[in-house]
C-alpha cells in the first residue's frame, strides 16, 4: 500500500522517516550525562590468534567505567567479533588479561570457561552479533531461552518454569515485544522483537558490564530507538556498556567515548563531543595517528 509519494527535491530525512513509521518521530539520540563510576573492566595487552594463525586482536588495552557507553568502531573485520568473544571468555587468548570488577577486587577471566567466569562473581551480559546462532535458540520459546541463562541457579532436581514465565510476561509488556505469547518459538518473531528478547533477558540479571554487538542491525527505526533507550537506561544505572556499532552517526551521538579498531589494534580513543566523524574515519584506516581522550 502506497502511503505517500514526494518529489526527491522536497524529501528530507525527517519527512521520509515520518512516512515510514506513520507518525512524527524525533531522530535525536539521547546521551544522558551520568557521573562516571569505578573501573569495571580492564583489558590489557590482549592478543588473539584466529584459525588461520593471524592476529585477529593485537595488543588491545582499554578500561571501561560504570555509567558510560564506550562505543567501538572499525571497518568490518577489524577484530570486533574476536574482541567481544575474548572478553566473554568464548575466544582463545594468546596474551594479555581481561579483568572484571568482582567483589572488592578484580578477577582475570583469561583461560576460564563461561561457568568458571560466573563462579568468580563476574557480572557480564553479552548480546552477540549472531542473535539466533549464538544469543538465542530459535526453536525454543522465550521461557526456555530464559532458562538457558538461569538454570544453574535452580535449586533441587526440578526446574522452576513459573518464575521465568513471569519474567517473560514482564519483558513483553515493558519492551513492547510483539509475539503471540511466551510459548512461541523465538525464530518466528521479527528481527526487532528477537533483539528485544535477547537484550531483555541479559539486562534482567542486572549486569555490571553489558556488551552489545551491532544491536540495531536490520531493525526498523522504532525498534532501534527502543534499543538505544534500553542502553541509556543501563548507563544511568551505573553499568559499563560496550557498544560495537557500524553507524558512525549513532556512535557519535550515543557514546561517551569511542574506541576505534584498525587491523585488530586500537588506533585511538576519542571523545565524540570534540572529535568529528572524519577524525574517527581516519582512525578506522589508521591514517590519523594515535588520538586519545581520557575519561
Mark where each language-model region is:
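Glycine-rich phosphate-binding loops of nucleotide-dependent enzymes
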Residues: 1-295
Amino acid at each position: 500500500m502506497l502511503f505517500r509519494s514526494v518529489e526527491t527535491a522536497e524529501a528530507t530525512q525527517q519527512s521520509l522517516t515520518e512516512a515510514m513509521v506513520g507518525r512524527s518521530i524525533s531522530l535525536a539520540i539521547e546521551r544522558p550525562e551520568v557521573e562516571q563510576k569505578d573501573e569495571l573492566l580492564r583489558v590489557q595487552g590482549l592478543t588473539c590468534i584466529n584459525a588461520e594463525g593471524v592476529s585477529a586482536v593485537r595488543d588491545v588495552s582499554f578500561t571501561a567505567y560504570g555509567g558510560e557507553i564506550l562505543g567501538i568502531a572499525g571497518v568490518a573485520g577489524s577484530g570486533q567479533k574476536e574482541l567481544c568473544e575474548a572478553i566473554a571468555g568464548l575466544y582463545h587468548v594468546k596474551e594479555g588479561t581481561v579483568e572484571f570488577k568482582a567483589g572488592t577486587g578484580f578477577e582475570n577471566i583469561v583461560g576460564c570457561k563461561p561457568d568458571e567466569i560466573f563462579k568468580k562473581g563476574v557480572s557480564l551480559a553479552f548480546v552477540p552479533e549472531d542473535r539466533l546462532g549464538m544469543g538465542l535458540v530459535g526453536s525454543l520459546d522465550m521461557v526456555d531461552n530464559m532458562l538457558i541463562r538461569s538454570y544453574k541457579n535452580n535449586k533441587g532436581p526440578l526446574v522452576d518454569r513459573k518464575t521465568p514465565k513471569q519474567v517473560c510476561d514482564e519483558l513483553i509488556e515493558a519492551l513492547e515485544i510483539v509475539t503471540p505469547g511466551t510459548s512461541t518459538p523465538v525464530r518466528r518473531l521479527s528481527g526487532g522483537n528477537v533483539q528485544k528478547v535477547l537484550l531483555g533477558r541479559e539486562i534482567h540479571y542486572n549486569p555490571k558490564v553489558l556488551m552489545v554487538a551491532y544491536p540495531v542491525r536490520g531493525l526498523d527505526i522504532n525498534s532501534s530507538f527502543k534499543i538505544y533507550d534500553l542502553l541509556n537506561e543501563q548507563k544511568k544505572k551505573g553499568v559499563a556498556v560496550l557498544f560495537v556499532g557500524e553507524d558512525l552517526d549513532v556512535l557519535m551521538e550515543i557514546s561517551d567515548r569511542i574506541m576505534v579498531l584498525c587491523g585488530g589494534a586500537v588506533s585511538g580513543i576519542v571523545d565524540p563531543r570534540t572529535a568529528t566523524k572524519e577524525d574517527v574515519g581516519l582512525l578506522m584506516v589508521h591514517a590519523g595517528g594515535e588520538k586519545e581522550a581520557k575519561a
